[in-house]
Amino acid sequence: MSKNVSRTVEQLAEPIVRELHLELVEVEYKKEGPNWYLRVFIDADRGVNLDDCEAVSEKLSEVLDEVDPIKEAYFLEVSSPGAERPLKKEADVKKAVGKGVYVTTYEPIDGQKAFEGVLVSFEDATLVIEGKNKTRTVTYTVPYAKVANARLSILL
């Protein structure tokens, strides 16, 4: 049920977010304790501020009240995905070239399923990540088809 709600809300939110010159990163609908939360994550190249979140929240609330795709009571939260935003689409990965990333895979590649470092390139559906293995620099080649999760990472 929550995946269907998320997909429906994505379809409703996308034109609103685009009209405000923002990007819809993710929609999450989940129960935490006794409450349901509808979380809408937005971003922009310039960053996201409180006014952006408020504008999306107000416009989306109007549409949700009209269409009423969610039967139970819920809390609507609109926010930035944060510094370690998820990389959900290929376009997100392309924009992350030159930045720190953390990637997990469905199956091991050279004996490991987690990779962290700088995304050097993303070409031909392959991520090239330059990371550290103790004291030496290592280059990992990860096929995009094997990526389970990817997000930006703050490298220290």
UniProtKB/Swiss-Prot annotation:
Main localization of the protein described in the UniProt heading: cytoplasm
Keywords annotated in UniProt: Cytoplasm, Ribosome biogenesis
Cellular location(s): Cytoplasm
InterPro entries: Ribosome_maturation_RimP (IPR003728), RimP_C (IPR028998), RimP_C_sf (IPR036847), RimP_N (IPR028989), RimP_N_sf (IPR035956)
S-S bonds: none
Cellular component aspect of the GO annotation: cytosol
GO BP term, example: ribosomal small subunit assembly
Taxonomic superkingdom: Bacteria
Family listed: Belongs to the RimP family.
Function text: Required for maturation of 30S ribosomal subunits.
Name under which the protein is recorded: Ribosome maturation factor RimP
